[in-house]
């Protein structure tokens, strides 16, 4: 999509919505009211997803690991999982408190049904999921990627078994249309027992080093079993290697038999060396799948180190992956020999005779690094490598002073913070074992300091001076331009950077979430770096901390008091003295604690608006509570899980996606209904919601209507359960397109039946 068209669509989208919203506010028609409420619901659901993944979960992660010192494995299955499920739990509480318990129960049933059918069904459409023994984490070759993913069969059986137990417990308790106090206690205790068991049986790597080491070990096994040689090698040439013959034809010696200098670069005429040029380009083309595979493995390692348990992917990581989606396609573009027709070289990259001028690359292959790329095919190279490593720095810097020509090296560019280093690409002229061992070391050292998927990719790709130099859009869609520092304005990056290319759905998501992201960026304090903490507070962070009492009060009570101004003044004075005495100490603790409180308040406010809007629809349009919970409420709360899990599957991090589909229902239903029911029954002093107050507290109960829509969805969940327990084993223990079609068809049929029953009021 061209830049003017992007700007035109963006401006038209926002201007038209502003006009329609203004018209809806000034008119009283049902259509305008429906449109206005629809916009409010969409933005509130977007707010729930963004604030949960980008604000609440990171703050909970920091608090659990840095303040309470809880391990990632425990926090991932408890605090972080609860934080991720907080929108659903809050929705259930607000619905029960508003007297529309059927809306809450319908949303929970609909959410479970949506995850088990639509989400898993679409996951099976993206890739065939095979349940095999001891295949919990797998790495994939270019040929098989996006086609077959493996998941440990024992983990699948465990997930289905726990889900079955949850289904029996919840179905038994809710079948009579009453939720007793003692049933709520049993639900919460059941969830706690299941969480403890899952924590003890958790087998996936939680540390970045563990994840990357496992990826490398599996890759080594695949290479050894299939006798695959790493194709990502070049035969680099130098001027000292070029010898003349009587015929005037020059020949080239391999890099491993010569000395190297990258201080100067000269041009080679590819027409004079057609066989060598063709061989070099052929080697590069063969190396493209290997480099893509390395990047995907590093992204999977990043995700496994940052997402533990049932946690959604952040909006920023989703946007970064969408921008680099070309990395996950099997179609690999290849290079051809340069010619006048292909325009592979620009005029600036040609010498006086029109031959390609290959220039050195800065900030990547330094003189000392060339020793790492010497071929170890003979003893001379090994001795040279040992001698070079032991030589002083100044000796080998002086040693390389002769002009050098590197046929397929990278054009020179200015040093910048966004320069992408080739050091993260598999080494060019080494054997498989050396490549993999060094790759593991370098990958662990570099990835530990990375803040985002964009950093992972940027540190794994070649960076070129111009977009039309040799490899433009061959490896990825990574932009060569600098990005804005504010993640909230990623839409601006897409509008101004032509090299970025995302799909229509992703573009629409940017348009919808950008206003919400900007509001959250300005309201909730955050740290840009995930690795460097206790940095000096910025002006924006100081303002956010000072204004936090006022924002919290407005989100919770909507009542303004002058005492809030005094409290903000006190906070400003304390921050001033803190800056004078201990400027950086406890900064991260303060930021993440305030961010956690503000995130909770934002969630509560957004859920309240959603419940009020849906309750208004129930009264105006005469729609049952259950059908709204099964459809609108479910779709709004589950769209984040759908996008996140599909993205996990596309990358190959299957264990998080499967765990979220089977673990989230356990969390939403058992803990959500149980905990919310306990809180409602203990807090209802008037008896408007809770019945049976004359008897023992254990017999206090909340009544709700079990209508035909709820029964219909329950039957759909049972059929989905039969698909997972019967059809999948009969289908050779895999979820392919046949199973996916069955699941998606089941959801469509059940939803259509519910809508039919609602319309005809059977």
UniProtKB/Swiss-Prot annotation:
Residues 1-26 form the signal peptide. GO terms for cellular component: endoplasmic reticulum; fungal-type vacuole membrane; Golgi apparatus; membrane. Residues 52-102, 178, 523-554, 611-615, 672-709, 760-762 are cytoplasmic. InterPro entries: CaCA_antiporter, NaCa_Exmemb, NCX_ion-bd_dom_sf. GO terms for biological process: calcineurin-mediated signaling; intracellular calcium ion homeostasis; monoatomic cation transport. Pfam families: Na_Ca_ex. It is a multi-pass membrane protein. Putative cation exchanger. This is Putative cation exchanger YDL206W.
């Amino acid at each position: 999509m061209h830049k003017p068209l992007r700007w035109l669509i963006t401006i038209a989208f926002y201007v038209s919505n502003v006009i329609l919203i203004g018209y809806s506010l000034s008119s009283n028609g049902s259509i305008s009211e429906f449109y206005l409420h629809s916009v409010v619901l969409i933005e509130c659901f977007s707010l729930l997803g963004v604030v949960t993944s980008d604000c609440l979960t990171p703050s909970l992660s920091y608090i659990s690991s840095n303040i309470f010192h809880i391990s990632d494995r425990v926090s991932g299955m408890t605090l972080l999982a609860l934080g991720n499920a907080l929108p659903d739990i809050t929705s259930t509480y607000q619905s029960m408190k508003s007297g529309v318990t059927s809306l809450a129960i319908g949303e929970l049933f609909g959410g479970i049904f949506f995850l088990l059918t639509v989400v898993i069904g679409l996951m099976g459409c993206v890739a065939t999921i095979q349940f095999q023994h001891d295949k919990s984490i797998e790495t994939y070759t270019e040929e098989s990627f996006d086609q077959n993913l493996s998941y440990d069969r024992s983990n699948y059986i465990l997930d289905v078994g726990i889900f079955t137990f949850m289904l029996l417990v919840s179905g038994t308790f809710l079948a009579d249309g009453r939720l007793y106090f003692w049933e709520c206690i049993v639900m919460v205790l059941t969830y706690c027992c299941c969480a403890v068991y899952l924590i003890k049986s958790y087998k996936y790597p939680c540390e970045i080093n563990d994840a990357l080491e496992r990826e490398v070990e599996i890759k080594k096994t695949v290479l050894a079993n299939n006798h695959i040689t790493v194709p990502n090698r070049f035969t680099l040439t130098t001027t000292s290697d070029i010898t003349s013959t009587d015929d005037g034809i020059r020949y080239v010696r391999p890099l491993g038999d010569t000395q190297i200098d990258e201080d100067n670069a000269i041009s080679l005429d590819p027409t004079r060396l057609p066989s060598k040029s063709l061989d070099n380009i052929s080697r590069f083309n063969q190396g493209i799948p290997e480099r893509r595979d390395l990047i995907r493995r590093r992204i999977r390692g990043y995700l496994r180190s940052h997402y533990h348990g049932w946690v959604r992917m952040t909006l920023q990581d989703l946007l970064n992956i969408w921008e680099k989606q070309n990395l996950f396609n099997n179609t690999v573009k290849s290079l051809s020999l340069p010619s006048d027709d292909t325009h592979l070289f620009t005029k600036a990259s040609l010498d006086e005779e029109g031959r390609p001028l290959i220039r050195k690359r800065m900030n990547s292959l330094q003189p000392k690094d060339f020793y790492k790329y010497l071929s170890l095919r003979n003893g001379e190279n090994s001795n040279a490598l040992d001698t070079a490593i032991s030589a002083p720095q100044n000796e080998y810097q002086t040693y390389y002073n002769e002009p050098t020509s590197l046929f397929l090296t990278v054009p020179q560019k200015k040093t910048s913070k966004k320069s992408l280093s080739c050091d993260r690409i598999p080494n060019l002229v080494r054997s498989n074992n050396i490549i993999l061992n060094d790759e593991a070391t370098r990958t662990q050292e570099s990835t530990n300091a990375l803040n985002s998927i964009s950093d992972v990719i940027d540190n794994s790709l070649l960076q070129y001076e111009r977009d039309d130099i040799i490899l433009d859009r061959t490896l990825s869609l990574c932009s060569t331009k600098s990005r804005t520092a504010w993640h909230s304005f990623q839409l601006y990056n897409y509008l101004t950077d032509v090299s970025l290319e995302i799909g229509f759905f992703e573009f629409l998501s940017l348009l919808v979430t950008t206003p919400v992201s900007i509001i959250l960026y300005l309201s909730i304090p955050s740290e840009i770096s995930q690795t460097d903490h206790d940095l000096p507070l910025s002006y924006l962070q100081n303002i956010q901390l000072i204004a936090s009492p006022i924002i919290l009060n407005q989100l919770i009570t909507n009542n303004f008091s002058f005492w809030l101004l005094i409290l903000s003044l006190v906070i400003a004075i304390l921050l001033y003295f803190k800056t004078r005495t201990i400027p950086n100490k406890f900064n991260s603790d303060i930021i993440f604690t305030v961010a956690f409180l503000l995130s909770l308040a934002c969630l509560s406010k957004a859920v309240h608006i959603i419940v009020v809007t849906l309750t208004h629809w129930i009264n105006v349009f005469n729609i049952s509570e259950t059908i709204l919970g099964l459809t609108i409420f479910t779709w709004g709360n589950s769209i984040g899980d759908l996008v996140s899990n599909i993205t996990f599957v596309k990358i190959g991090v299957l264990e998080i996606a499967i765990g979220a589909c089977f673990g989230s229902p356990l969390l939403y239903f058992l803990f959500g209904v149980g905990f919310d029911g306990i809180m409602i029954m203990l807090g209802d002093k008037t008896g408007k919601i809770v019945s049976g107050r004359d008897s023992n507290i254990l017999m206090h109960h909340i009544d709700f209507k079990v209508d035909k829509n709820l029964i219909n969805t329950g039957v759909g969940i049972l059929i989905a359960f039969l698909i997972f327990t019967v059809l999948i084993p009969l289908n050779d223990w895999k979820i392919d397109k046949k199973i996916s079609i069955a699941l998606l068809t089941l959801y469509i049929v059940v939803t259509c039946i519910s809508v039919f029953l609602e319309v005809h009021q059977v």
